[in-house]
């Protein structure tokens, strides 16, 4: 059975664990239609456009 030869120091242990719980910042791009910030590869929440065409209905268009 494999057994560690030396005790893992708290510093080494914490460095190993640090990458698992690391939070990466959200990357935002601007919508080509309205200029609102949106997530990449997602339809715009403000106007509903994605890839140059209307992808989903928004509250403003559904009300009219």
Curated annotation (Swiss-Prot):
Residues that span the membrane, as ranges: none
An MF annotation (GO) of this entry: structural constituent of ribosome
GO-annotated biological processes: translation
InterPro entries, A to Z: Ribosomal_bL32 (IPR002677), Ribosomal_bL32_bact (IPR044957), Ribosomal_zn-bd (IPR011332)
Compositional bias annotation for Basic and acidic residues: 11-22
Organism domain of life: Bacteria
Region (Disordered), start-end ranges: 1-22
Gene Ontology cellular-component terms listed: large ribosomal subunit
This protein's UniProt keywords: Ribonucleoprotein, Ribosomal protein
Ranges of compositional bias, category Basic residues: 1-10
Family to which this protein belongs: Belongs to the bacterial ribosomal protein bL32 family.
Record's protein name: Large ribosomal subunit protein bL32
Organism whose genome encodes this protein: Sorangium cellulosum (strain So ce56)
Gene, per the UniProt record: rpmF
């Amino acid at each position: 059975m494999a057994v560690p030869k030396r005790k893992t120091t708290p510093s080494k242990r914490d460095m190993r664990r640090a990458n698992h719980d690391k939070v990466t910042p959200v990357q935002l791009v601007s919508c080509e239609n309205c200029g609102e910030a949106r997530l990449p590869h997602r339809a715009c929440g403000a106007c509903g456009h994605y890839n140059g065409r209307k992808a989903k209905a928004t509250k403003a268009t559904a009300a009219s």
